[in-house]
Amino acid sequence: MALFYDQSFDLGLVQKINMETESDFIFNTNMLQFTDVTTKHMLSSPELDRTGHVEGQRKRKRTIFSRAQLSELERAFMITPYPDITLRERLAALTLLPESKIQVWFQNRRARSMKSKKLITPVSRRSPAKDCTFPATHPDLNLEQSPEANKSLRHHQQSLIRQALNPWPQNRPPISPDLPEILQWANRNSETPGDSSFSSCPSERIQHPFPNQSSSVWQMNCFAAHPEGLKSYCTTSQALYSSVSVDQMIPAHPSSLEEALQRQALTHYPQTSLGDISDLIYKAAVVTNLEEC
């Protein structure tokens, strides 16, 4: 140890240096400032500068329109809410605004008008319902009509109903003028059962009138019920109609009698309905049954 020990080296100086370095370390007098290289690189990167610039561009500035510009735009919107490119360019030259701004203004204005129409239309639909008056469609419901007009209307309706119920009011043949004489003759000669039975036909007609049947149909009803009366009627009318024989008026066979009755009905009724045809068939069947009996 003594060989390597330097006598000129002072131990006190070494201790003093150690104490100074400790004090400097404690009080941070000569301490180096360390910086983070990554953070310094991130702050100085150009990408962050670009993103900040883009965020600044995204924030648009709102265009403030003057009163003159708004009046011109509103006037153009009243003319047409969908202006073409030529009209937008003219408005841009007139209002000193870019054409893109004018296009955006028209889009916003159309949206506002559609929203206002949706809010106004329910109110406008409900309001005229209070003032509307419903006209009287049916004449009977109109209370302001006079009683004379009501009477004439009822008379017209009754006439229409009568025309509908009577399909052939104009084709009715007149009553035979010889019928009263025949009835009187039948009343005088009431000894035979056929004449007495035939004279009862007018009373039956009075008791059971047929408004839709003519006199010929009524005569045919009586003849069907009383065939003897038909023979007496034909014998009395032979003097008036000498050209017609009794055999032609009253055939011997029942089938020919049916044909004669049908011919007589068809001559008076050229147009017959299904109901009349069925009545004729039924009456012809009754006549044949009476003849067979």
UniProtKB/Swiss-Prot annotation:
Keyword Transferase: no
Tissue specificity: Restricted to the mesendoderm precursors during gastrulation.
UniProt superkingdom: Eukaryota
GO CC annotation terms, alphabetical: nucleus
InterPro entries named among the record's database cross-references: HD, Homeodomain-like_sf, SEBOX
Pfam family, one: Homeodomain
GO process terms (BP): cell differentiation; endoderm development; heart morphogenesis; regulation of DNA-templated transcription; regulation of transcription by RNA polymerase II
DNA-binding region (UniProt annotation): 58-117
Record keywords, A-Z: Developmental protein, Differentiation, DNA-binding, Homeobox, Nucleus, Transcription, Transcription regulation
Primary site of residence: nucleus
Induction pattern: Regulated by the Nodal pathway.
Record-level Gene Ontology MF annotations: DNA-binding transcription factor activity, RNA polymerase II-specific; RNA polymerase II transcription regulatory region sequence-specific DNA binding
Entry's family note: Belongs to the paired homeobox family.
PANTHER family: HOMEOBOX PROTEIN SEBOX
Protein name as catalogued: Homeobox protein SEBOX
Gene that produces this protein: sebox
